[in-house]
């Protein structure tokens, strides 16, 4: 195993493959405070890519209800348990540094399969059968499902809670599926970092299914090969006719009704770190505002999917899922500064990928306090630009308010 630097855990770690990095990296941000669990993203993906025989259980995009839901069932809890068995009580953060074992480091210590390069497991058929299991099931007193606290709650954290977690392949910087494949059938595209399967080389050993910590590599029994999310790469290449040759967001992003999704491409330096691109919305949300956090960064794959954590969920649960930056992310989101509030308006305003934004300052609307902190709202205008530098759209922080005229009072 070689040594690679993983900025999400703030240290070098062991990885079975040689280190290589793409020129740009596909990345996305999901705002979990907005998700309504409508599954429109899920069906947009399903109707585009996985509607054929043998793909019945394939949901490349899924939306599960946390803390009890999961697809496949218990995918995260089972891996967390495996890691704790290998490294009892050692899976801890010290500030921004993860001092426990990643799935690659734990595989070396695991006393099970000596040939295992990545710690993981194969889900059972039963665990794949119910993508919406425990949908809308809240946490009640003492963790009992579907019950409610009779004595009320104290905000901002709720005693009775659940939230929707939308998931696709994270197109990781250090993919577990790629590291585990004995056929070298999995690779990252050099132009955008999308993780793909060469189906001519795949022999269906399912090592990738076992190794992916997020369980987004899926075996198709009719063809006996692995299939997975391809990040709608023809759209990234600008081949969708509706995009006029410009890179477009994926089907699941474009269909999002709750406006929770923003997708982009970030420039990557030779050492694997993100190149500074101050006015790329991805770079701003992840590296500057730091409101968007990776999903289970302690697994060690450096996922390129980022989440704005739900503000009503107990902090310890969120820290286990998104790492030590949760408190700062939620505080920044609840009392956003002028630039962050403007950038948040760009979610789902267009299907084209935003490569750069510009803010034109507008008038002050009002001042108030949020949780004891001063907040000022400005009606700024934010302008989004595509890869060619052309303007995609411009929108304002304060959305227009329309009053229905009397002659249309009863119309729908």
Report the location of each language-model feature.
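Non-ligating segments of multi-cofactor redox enzymes
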Residues: 1-412
